[in-house]
Amino acid sequence: MEGEAGGTLMQEAWESIDAARNYKNELQERMIALELARNQIKESAAQTCHALRQHFVDLKTAITKLLDERQETLLQEVSAIEQENIKPLDDCQKLLEQGVNTADDLLKEGEMAVSGIAGNNENLYNFTNKALHNQLDSLPEVPSLVEVPCLSAQLDEIFLCVVRDHICKLGSVASRPPVQIEELIERPGAILVKWCKCDDDFVAQDYRLQYRKNTASHFEDVYVGSESEFIVLQIDPNVDYQFRVCARGDGRQEWSPWSVLQTSRTTLVPHEWSTGYDGYSLSSRRNIALRNDSVSHGVLYSKAATYLSGQTLTFRVETVGQMDKHDGIGVCVEQFDCESLQRDKAVCVSTSGAVYVNGKEMTNQLPPVSPGSTITFDMEIMTLGQTNNEGPSQKRRVTISSSNREVVFDWLLEQSCDSLYFGCSFVHPGWKVLVF
């Protein structure tokens, strides 16, 4: 009994030790998270202070420059008015000085004439004759003070009050950005970014999403629009990327502060079309297929069976050509050398919107395909049936969506499979399809 009791106590002791170790690890992880939170507050505060100081330094410089330019403009205007109106007065000044000089000369000559030898009428005659010719009764017009400019500066003293009001409302400090990244979901060769508003009072008109590799120094704009999610394509697998989002308020021009940086990666290899099909031309990343004008046509399949249950497979039709009833975009279990995906062990959507399951057309349809249309496939394995000669049967719940409409049905496969191929077939050229 004592041995059993001792063994029980030992077991309890080891369990307590494990619990204490796990508790310690959890606390240490929370301490790391707490330190990250502390650093975010301190670093964002320092960055905000630097941004505020730099903004106001730039603003002061710009305002001082504008005020100096305005002052110089007004001073030049004063100088121009002064010069323009002083010139006539200078001309009048010259006439007056000339008249004074003439009068002085006449005075001297007259005084000499009258103080000369008595009876010398010739000198008196010459003087009076000269005085008559000088028109001593003709005086130049001198403008009165009310007729000449009296310059002054009109300064609107309310301007300072208006500026003060604007300055008091200039800028703001927010403890949190109005929008944050909510979820990052890995997709094959892509990452789905979802964001949401954190401020109910903020009315967002547009959102702006940027991303970069962890090793890059600059962010790139990848989306600007009103949606609250976006799939970022051309993501290299197993490489960390950083994402951030901001918003623009209704009727505003400036963007809000950026959200907290979020890092994510995808471990899923990108979907690719197979090479070597004469009827199709592929992009460099082999995720875009263009039906060319080659006479050969048939189904273009994926490079491998990369579509897994539980994932979302999306086709975006970039350009369209002439429709044909045998056209189709969809998924299949196996690759067959055939003309269309409208066959057994395949599900597809025709360009007219008809849905085919194992070669049979369904009653429900989707809208016809048009430029920019997206067709998404979502599948979920429901049950595994009894085993037959080829293996256990499998039922999948399939949801196909396009243009805000969807078709839901169960797809029964005679044998189970972990992954599916995707494919497309177009009879006529001009169709271009992006897969992701």
UniProtKB/Swiss-Prot annotation:
Q: Where in the cell is it found?
A: Cytoplasm
A GO cellular component term found in this entry reads:
cytoplasm
The coiled-coil regions, if any, are: 9-87
- Keyword DNA repair in the entry? The reply is no
Check the record and name the PROSITE patterns matching this protein.
FN3 (PS50853)
Its primary localisation, in coarse terms, equals cytoplasm
- The UniProt record lists the Fibronectin type-III domain at 177-270
Alphabetically ordered keywords of this record:
Coiled coil, Cytoplasm
InterPro entries cross-referenced by the UniProt entry: FN3_dom, FN3_sf, Ig-like_fold
General function of this protein: May play a role in the negative regulation of cell cycle progression.
Which family would the database say this protein is a member of? Belongs to the cytokine receptor-like factor 3 family.
Tell me what this protein is called. Cytokine receptor-like factor 3
State the organism named in the record.
Xenopus laevis
